Amino acid sequence: MTAHSFALPVIIFTTFWGLVGIAGPWFVPKGPNRGVIITMLVATAVCCYLFWLIAILAQLNPLFGPQLKNETIWYVRFLWE
């Protein structure tokens, strides 16, 4: 994965969830539950962004690769040729 193809989604998703968490509370109507709704919006933005970030970083540098037996590797190679 090149630096450009990784940086663009990170910038886009960071901007999106930043807008949801920062600009979203400005559009909540006044009422008795306004504080609860704002808290829910900010918590949702933070949780969704962290979930996405952890998932994309785990795919970027995995801790271990697929565990294949030699017979499986030879069979796959035979089928692909």
Swiss-Prot record:
Topology of the protein relative to the lipid bilayer: Multi-pass membrane protein
UniProt record, GO biological process: proton transmembrane transport; regulation of macroautophagy; transmembrane transport; vacuolar acidification
MF terms in GO: ATPase-coupled ion transmembrane transporter activity; proton-transporting ATPase activity, rotational mechanism
Transmembrane regions: 8-28, 36-56
GO cellular component: clathrin-coated vesicle membrane; endosome membrane; lysosomal membrane; membrane; phagocytic vesicle membrane; synaptic vesicle membrane; vacuolar proton-transporting V-type ATPase, V0 domain
Protein family membership: Belongs to the V-ATPase e1/e2 subunit family.
Listed name of the protein: V-type proton ATPase subunit e 2
Species this chain originates from: Homo sapiens
Gene, per the UniProt record: ATP6V0E2
